[in-house]
């Protein structure tokens, strides 16, 4: 599931004229179409609320980037997305997905190097190897360990 929320009293502005239902039925990725991530989201899971609440050129925040679905939705809908991800392997997945879709090079803002240049520096001779993403069919690790009966 994906959630959208706000702090009471700070409801986001409505920029679209249509009124939408609070739940949506969206298609999921077929197993063979997943972009190297166990739970990729359909682009409309992010595109619908973007179009409803964020003006073109506006900013969206993505604290759990995963395979980059919100980045891709922002690209498709003319919104900016500030994203982060704890897993370096999934950053590679998201950046490579964006580059493949847009035909552009991702640029490191700090010094202007491309993603490819940074990858070569970090991986050396293995720079052309695909990102070592976790098994997309494996169950994600639970957030908490179950309590043991002692």
Regions found by a protein language model. Give the residues of each.
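Positively charged, low-complexity intrinsically disordered regions
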Residues: 32-35, 120, 145
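General helical structural elements
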Residues: 45, 83, 101, 123-126, ...
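Long, low-complexity, intrinsically disordered segments
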Residues: 135-150
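Short, intrinsically disordered low-complexity segments
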Residues: 40, 78, 96, 118-121, ...
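Core catalytic lobe of class I
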Residues: 1-91, 150
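S-adenosyl-L-methionine
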Residues: 95-135
């Amino acid at each position: 599931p994906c959630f959208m929320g706000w702090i009471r009293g700070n409801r986001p502005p409505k920029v679209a004229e249509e009124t939408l239902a609070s739940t949506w039925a969206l298609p999921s990725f077929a197993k063979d179409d997943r972009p190297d991530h166990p739970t990729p989201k359909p682009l409309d899971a992010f595109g619908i609320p973007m179009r409803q609440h964020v003006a073109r050129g506006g900013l969206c925040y993505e604290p759990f980037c995963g395979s980059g679905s919100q980045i891709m939705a922002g690209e498709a809908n003319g919104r900016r997305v500030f994203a982060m991800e704890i897993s370096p392997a999934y950053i590679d997945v998201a950046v490579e997905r964006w580059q493949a879709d847009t035909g552009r090079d991702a640029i490191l803002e700090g010094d202007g190097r491309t993603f490819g240049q940074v990858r070569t520096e970090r991986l050396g001779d293995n720079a052309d190897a695909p990102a070592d993403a976790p098994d997309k069919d494996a169950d994600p690790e639970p957030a908490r360990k179950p309590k043991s009966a002692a």
